[in-house]
Amino acid sequence: LAARVAAVQGDTDVARACYEQLHGAPGATSSFLRALAMSSSQADLREAWSLFDAMMTHAPQASSTHIPDWIVMLRAAAGDARIPVHRVVSLLQMQEETEAFDTPWNVPPSVQAQLVQSVAAHTALVEGLLERGDVSRAWGVWDAMVHRGVAPDVWALKTLCRLYFVAGHPARALECVMHWCHRGVRLPAPRSGVVRMHVPKVQDLGQCAMRVDATPSSRHVVRLRPTTHLANTLLLGLYRARAWETLMLVWHALQPTLHVQPDTASIDLMLRAARAEARASQVPCTWAPAARAYFVRLLTAQHPELQACTNPLEAPGRRGWIVRSELQLRRWERWMEGRLRRLWRGAADNLPPVTISTPLPHVCLDARVFHHYAELVLTLMEVDFPGASHATTDQLWEELFLIAAWMRALDVTPMRETLCLWCSVHDERLPPAASTASWRTWLAQWLGEASVPSDAELGAWYRAHRAHVD
């Protein structure tokens, strides 16, 4: 198990140590081979090929049972720019329209027959070509796979989404997910023999259609069941493409349309996108308040005891009485402003707020999610949104530090960036003549004296993250 985990993480040294302790056991050999093949070191790659040759030489009759090892080495060859592409794709009996078919692989016919009909082998080939940077040929392999009649799985669809994001066509990635997961695709009948690859230009990938419906003798409709990992790949690609509003719309449709349950990574991407959309929007933002309300609803639904948490700024102590008095005064001001606004507007707002009304998942929120939520709350203090006022800004300021009480109650240790954010904002908005000792004493009691950021650390963080606000 340790060798397999090390192989997944790409830790060649740990995988080698496990392999040596197990004295070359069959399971450890495959894990060690994967660790070597996924390494970026040329020496590790040469060792992987030597180990693979030894495995196939010592047990040639069992080569058909080593299909996963063949797939691992196929991916390694596809990602190695020193090996010509036409030699790599020939293992799956593919050739480009302008290339002659090449057969450089010494592979048993039974193994090649299994690889040709394996969706995992085609996906590994696409991933390797993407690692090489050859997006066009990677698309050609995916197109040839469905033209051959090999039904893709969710992992293959995830790789196709990555392909479109790398090519700069995020809309096509979204269309493919809806096409394969919502409507379904009728694949052609399985075919054997060599398949010709259609390799378009990268800029033309947004208009290229795959060869799936041209054959009249079609099989059943293939409809994939999306997973949370596929959804997170789509959300991450939209975030990197700066399509934040589209990301929020997709996130809102995960459960009702795709029937995908969000996880911690999904919520983290939603908070980051809502903050980025609020920063970039030229009009009052709507998704950021909705994301904030959703997160609070999710947190209090999973942990009702958090509603009893008190603000750390109201911690008892003689040096904190100014801050406590200021908080009480602001609460009275918010109450009065709310009453006057309802009387003036007739209890109706001009713009109804955007809400995220999807069912609440049960997730384990970590320190990074809380940090991005704190950044979202801080952003809402500085941007315009429907219903924004001085009273709501003061309320957000209190909530920013209430996050610390929530994390303490849930036994979640904050990131260093979160501590700097709290201390910096605390010092910025501190009332005149108020002391900073009360807040820092509360942090020291919770995390220890060493956790309180120094003035030099706060200055460096402020110059990197907050200087642009002024």
Kindly give the residue locations of the regions a language model identified.
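A basic, Ser/Thr-enriched alpha-helical scaffold prevalent
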Residues: 1-470
